[in-house]
């Protein structure tokens, strides 16, 4: 007698999930508006306008939200997300002077608000369009910004 065979079919309902990846980089910058006088820049930006620049140990949180693939069980391969963050953020910005060493900030004041927006744009080009992207950047443990597109 032959065993009775059957096929197991799993029904997995697609669901929305957010995945997060953290990264870290160090960079220097100077906050400065060329159209303002030296006094106006110092008054507005304070120590962040230091002509010799200053640095931060940035912490980055990247959030990707979308439907989980019912076959793989993944929203996005975390190894790929790590690769995108390394290629688009860490490699171009780590241990760099953002004002002088990057094209992104040659004409754009590297405030935390502008840095998070640039990072979001760089990563958005790598993340599938059907997924939502949010980027949070910590300039200090108490000061952080977030951009969602």
Map each language-model feature to its residues:
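Intrinsic disorder/low-complexity segments
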Residues: 1-12
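Charge-rich, low-complexity N-terminal segments
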Residues: 12-149
């Amino acid at each position: 007698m032959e065993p009775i065979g059957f096929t197991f079919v799993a029904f997995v309902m697609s669901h929305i999930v957010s995945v997060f990846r953290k990264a870290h980089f160090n960079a220097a910058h100077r906050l400065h508006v060329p159209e303002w006088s030296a006094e106006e820049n110092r008054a507005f930006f304070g120590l962040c306008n230091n002509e010799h620049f200053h640095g931060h140990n940035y912490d980055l949180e990247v959030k990707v939200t979308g439907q989980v693939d019912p076959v793989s069980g993944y929203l996005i391969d975390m190894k790929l997300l790590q690769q995108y963050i390394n290629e688009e953020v860490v490699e171009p910005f780590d241990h760099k002077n953002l004002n002088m060493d990057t094209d992104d900030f040659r004409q754009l004041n590297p405030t935390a608000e502008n840095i998070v927006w640039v990072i979001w744009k760089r990563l958005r080009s790598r993340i599938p369009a059907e997924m939502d992207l949010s980027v949070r950047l910590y300039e200090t443990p108490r000061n952080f910004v977030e951009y969602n597109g």
